[in-house]
């Protein structure tokens, strides 16, 4: 197994909490956060230069499915709140990578950390023997470079 590399590339995006994100108690229903975090991972790749459709076409992959996730909910959010999701890759291995999400809420003193979450994702293409299955593939070097913060020259 290859040693994880330490990327530096980060993306931040603001998300408005909508009425449909909330439960009867008026706070965000936790599965909605996971949908927001999944979108944040896709926006990280967009910030690196690829929309998901471009990645699929250019590298002949199905996507980068999540194989593990965890979250620590520190401060709730409610309808109308604007949260900031900060996303970065924290480690890259041969065919998988780790994502860290930090969700912030505005406060009088700046921002407060509301959620800490992690994901493990696999770079996956169609299985050569069964198109209904996926097979992990090595991450292309250009993807690794961009996720580590390098730009193509």
How should these model regions be labeled?
Residues 60, 67, 83, 97:
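Exposed loop/turn and edge beta-strand positions of beta-sandwich/beta-sheet ligand-binding modules
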Residues 2-66, 125-153:
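Hot-dog-fold acyl-thioester-processing enzymes
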Residues 2-5, 73, 77-82, 90-153:
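HotDog/MaoC-like acyl-thioester-processing domains
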Residues 68-72:
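Short alpha-helix capping/helix-loop boundary micro-motifs
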